[in-house]
């Protein structure tokens, strides 16, 4: 019982402080333990660790290369599978890739998802060149191919929410 709590947010990939829950058995336990909506920041922690070599200090233009599409997609696929197994409704926060949109559109029984305005407006690498670290966020701004698919999905009402805030 979580009095006064409207939902739970889980970071599957490291993003802000020590809020990480990357083990999918633990994620299934969380899903089974509450009737509240659970929202997920969906990036695969193991992939982030493996790809650390692509991260270059003081070079924001490498951010989207390090945190690539596969890092998000791998986590999103696992979350969809867990939602289907547990029959629990979940929400995946700030989707950034065409591949995620395509898989999520086909799996709406237990899963909703959102996009943020900055992922609809900006694209890599130009956003990083122009804005530097101001363009750096998790998951990252991706190239124009993804922006185009996100915009079309929003137009087609495939996206459940348009979130205005991302703080990490």
Residue ranges and their predicted role:
Residues 2-10, 16-165:
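Histidine/acidic residue-rich metal-binding segments in metalloenzymes
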């Amino acid at each position: 019982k979580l009095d006064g709590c409207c939902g739970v947010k889980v970071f599957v990939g490291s993003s802000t402080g020590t809020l990480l829950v990357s083990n999918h058995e633990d994620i299934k336990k969380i899903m089974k333990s509450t009737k509240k909506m659970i929202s997920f920041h969906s990036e695969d922690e193991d992939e982030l660790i493996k790809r650390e070599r692509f991260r270059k200090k003081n070079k924001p233009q490498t951010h989207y290369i390090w945190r690539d599409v596969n890092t998000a997609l791998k986590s999103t696929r696992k979350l969809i599978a867990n939602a289907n197994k547990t029959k629990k409704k979940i929400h995946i926060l700030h989707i950034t890739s065409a591949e995620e949109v395509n898989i999520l559109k086909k799996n709406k029984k237990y899963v909703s998802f959102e996009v943020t305005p900055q992922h609809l407006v900006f694209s890599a690498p130009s956003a990083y060149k122009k804005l530097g670290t101001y363009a750096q966020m998790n998951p990252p701004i991706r190239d124009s191919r993804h922006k185009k698919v996100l915009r079309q999905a929003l137009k087609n009402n495939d996206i459940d929410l348009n979130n205005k805030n991302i703080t990490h």
